């Protein structure tokens, strides 16, 4: 096939010192009839329109670059095709290769009802939280009242213990007194010489 003609055949020395020589990919392509024929051969079986136009353009670019013997960017091919065809109109008129029916979306009533119920529950929870935030002292009063009742119960139990211990001490003191009286009687009986038991002992 024909070779692509490259514009700007001047020598590199003719350019200014601040300008660099363009890379082969950035060089402009002179679209001669032979080069256009190479492009049409590369486009066989590939239409650069529709939703898959960029994938088709990759195949066209690879085949076209192989035919002319140099790499050509896709933008150069797009620009040249747009000079020959109305690419936007072709793209819009292209039929989709897959079914794509359009219909209005309607949210099911079940989901709407669930959302409404969820909102009601959330509102009730928020009201309860607001009540708890507004009345923080009520819980503290309950705690203080419960602690006060516990303190009273502990005081009563301690008083009962003291009573029991005092009663036990009184009983023990009474028992000790009784025992001391009995022992005193026994001792006096044994030490008295006028007792009959002592007289009997003397007689014997």
Swiss-Prot record:
Residues 1-15 have a biased composition (Gly residues). Its main location: nucleus. The modification Phosphoserine is found at residues 23, 191, 195. It holds the Pfam family Eaf7. Signal peptide: none annotated. The modification N-acetylglycine is found at residue 2. There is a cross-link at residue 127 (Glycyl lysine isopeptide (Lys-Gly) (interchain with G-Cter in SUMO2)). One of its GO terms (biological process) is regulation of cell cycle. Residues 1-27, 128-204 are annotated as: Disordered. It is found in: Nucleus. One of its GO terms (cellular component) is nucleoplasm. Keywords: Acetylation, Activator, Chromatin regulator, Growth regulation, Isopeptide bond, Nucleus, Phosphoprotein, Transcription, Transcription regulation, Ubl conjugation. The keyword Zinc-finger does not apply. Residues 128-140, 153-175 have a biased composition (Basic and acidic residues). Residues 189-198 have a biased composition (Low complexity). Component of the NuA4 histone acetyltransferase (HAT) complex which is involved in transcriptional activation of select genes principally by acetylation of nucleosomal histones H4 and H2A. This modification may both alter nucleosome - DNA interactions and promote interaction of the modified histones with other proteins which positively regulate transcription. Component of the NuA4 histone acetyltransferase complex which contains the catalytic subunit KAT5/TIP60 and the subunits EP400, TRRAP/PAF400, BRD8/SMAP, EPC1, DMAP1/DNMAP1, RUVBL1/TIP49, RUVBL2, ING3, actin, ACTL6A/BAF53A, MORF4L1/MRG15, MORF4L2/MRGX, MRGBP, YEATS4/GAS41, VPS72/YL1 and MEAF6. MRGBP may interact directly with MORF4L1/MRG15 and MORF4L2/MRGX. Belongs to the EAF7 family. This is MRG/MORF4L-binding protein. It comes from Mus musculus (Mouse). The lineage of its organism: Eukaryota, Metazoa, Chordata, Craniata, Vertebrata.
């Amino acid at each position: 096939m024909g070779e692509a003609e490259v514009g700007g055949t001047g020598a590199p020395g003719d350019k200014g010192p601040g300008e660099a020589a363009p890379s082969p990919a950035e060089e402009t392509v002179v679209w001669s009839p032979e080069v256009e024929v190479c492009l049409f051969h590369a486009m066989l079986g590939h239409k650069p329109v529709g939703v898959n136009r960029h994938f088709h353009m990759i195949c066209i670019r690879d085949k076209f670059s192989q035919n002319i013997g140099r790499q050509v960017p896709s933008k150069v091919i797009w620009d040249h095709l747009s000079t020959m065809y109305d690419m936007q109109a072709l793209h819009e008129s292209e039929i989709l290769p897959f079914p794509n029916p359009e219909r209005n979306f309607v949210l099911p009533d079940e989901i709407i009802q669930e959302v409404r119920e969820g909102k009601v529950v959330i509102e009730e929870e928020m009201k309860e939280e607001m009540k708890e935030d507004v009345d923080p002292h009520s819980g503290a009063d309950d705690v203080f009242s419960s602690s006060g009742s516990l303190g009273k119960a502990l005081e009563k139990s301690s008083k009962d213990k003291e009573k029991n211990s005092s009663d036990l001490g009184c009983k023990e003191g009474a028992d000790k007194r009784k025992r001391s009286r009995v022992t005193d009687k026994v001792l006096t009986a044994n030490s008295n010489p006028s007792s009959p038991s002592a007289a009997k002992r003397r007689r014997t």
